[in-house]
Amino acid sequence: MTETQHIFRLTVHRFMDFPLSIYSSFTQLKPTPGLKKIIAVAAISGVSLIFLACHLKRKRGKKKINAPQTEPGQFILQCSRHVAEKGSSCSSSRQNLTLSLGSIKERGSQSHLNGDLCSKYSGSMQSLASVQSCHSCACINSNSWDKTDEDEINIPVTTPENLYLMGMELFEEALRRWEQALTFRSRQAEDEANCSSIKLGAGDAIAEENIEDVISADFIHKLEALLQRAYRLQEEFEATLGASDPASLANDIDKDTDITVMDNGGDFQQRDTLSIASTDSFLSAAELADNQDMRATCGLDSLYHHALYEEAMQLAEEGKVHCRVLRTEMLECLGDSDFLAKLHCIRQAFQEIILQRENRIFLMGTGRKLLSALIVKARKNPKKFEDAYFDMMSFLEQPESWDTVEKELLSRGMKCMNFYDIVLDFIVMDSLEDLENPPLSIQNVVRNRWLNSSFKETAVTSSCWSVLRQKKQEMKVPNGFFANFYTVCEQLCPVLAWGFLGPRSSLHDLCCFYKAQIMYFLKDIFDFEKVRYSDVEHLAEDIMKCLQRRTELTVVYTGEESARRPPVLN
């Protein structure tokens, strides 16, 4: 014990004597100029380091004061609560837009009677929106945790355009899911058909298989109808962010008449309308009511009963339905078989329509009235056109003329002597395609900046007449269908060509409006939502309603209500 104390005392004495020994050694040194400089530099450096350390310590102390001291569990709870609040706000905005999508989907299928099915679709989209919004908002907040409070968090501004884009993303995701379901179900049906040859069973098993086949076919038809409506809705959404040309503006007018969303109170919420002539909308409440009545007759029940369409689909798949030109993409059909099946049904419906004399009078009078209004808009006298038009109608009213007409049309590749094939397909749609791709000679004249408008119009008229004159020389029947048709075209084609290819004017707007209404009528009659493919009578009735509605819109737009005189028939 004494030795330990002795060692400790020696250690303390040496520690106390160490500064004295250092001081004595410094006093013995001779202060040379170099040593003084070294000591001065060392002193200054030491003082600088002390001040720098104090400054850094002060700054670190401020940060510690600003940062709230929380326990790990509380910090995780606050972060999760913050994420939940942000996720709920984002998901609520997307769900609101999704609800609007669901409400717009309900407009084509009798919103009160058919709200359950559409609510299922919108409910699935809401769940998808909530999942995606929570993930996206959680990522944003997780990135902001590592930042200090001095840095501002950049949150995207909520604008109608952003909400629109978010809704379109969700809508496209739903479309992909439906397409996958349709593809998967079709593939499964094909596999079952391939394996049906080796299946053996009793009568009960065969009956169960037949019931499953019926349910499967019904599901596929409903899914196809839903996809067709969704494609139409997607195109209408894409056109909402800008409409500068008359065709798109006519599209807006059409959507104002076709898309009327009924809310819980039953009131119509009509969207803002855009008129081609920059005037107020000419749609009336009565027209919207008629539109809703027609939609009530073409509700969701028609999606379950397509007896006429199913029979036509079997014929189309067997290759027994023929046409001159496939219009699958133009008329927004799901495929060539879908187009041919609907075409077969529409041919039967038009055959039923033409059998009634009042329908023939309506069709002839409507054509004369609208085309005469177009010529009047071009500031020309429609007298020659009306005379040629009446001569052609009188020729077609004679039963003995149809043998010649059939021979002429068969030589042009006509597959069926029907109103759709002759008027809508051969005359109307082919003419619209020709006007979209005019000859180079006409294009060069119209694009020439050194020519005035009157000279361009004269040149376009001369080009049309020369083409028609050449076609007349190639006719095999001098007084047949094409002779009368070319006589009508001599008065009408120059007006149409100048209206579509000429400068922006009231004639150009009217031509674009006519084209838009024609295309929407054609798409309407190929749409399960607008017409009923249950039987020929209902389909013919719905086609006539669509035609009358489009005609009324066009007549109101052209301001030709006073010119409703019936055609003179011999």
Curated annotation (Swiss-Prot):
The keyword Cytoplasm does not apply. The chain crosses the membrane at residues 34-54. It holds the Pfam family Miga. It is found in: Mitochondrion outer membrane. GO terms for biological process: mitochondrial fusion. GO terms for molecular function: protein heterodimerization activity; protein homodimerization activity. The keyword Acetylation does not apply. It comes from the Eukaryota. Belongs to the mitoguardin family. Regulator of mitochondrial fusion: acts by forming homo- and heterodimers at the mitochondrial outer membrane and facilitating the formation of pld6/MitoPLD dimers. May act by regulating phospholipid metabolism via pld6/MitoPLD. This is Mitoguardin 1. It comes from Xenopus laevis (African clawed frog). The gene is miga1.
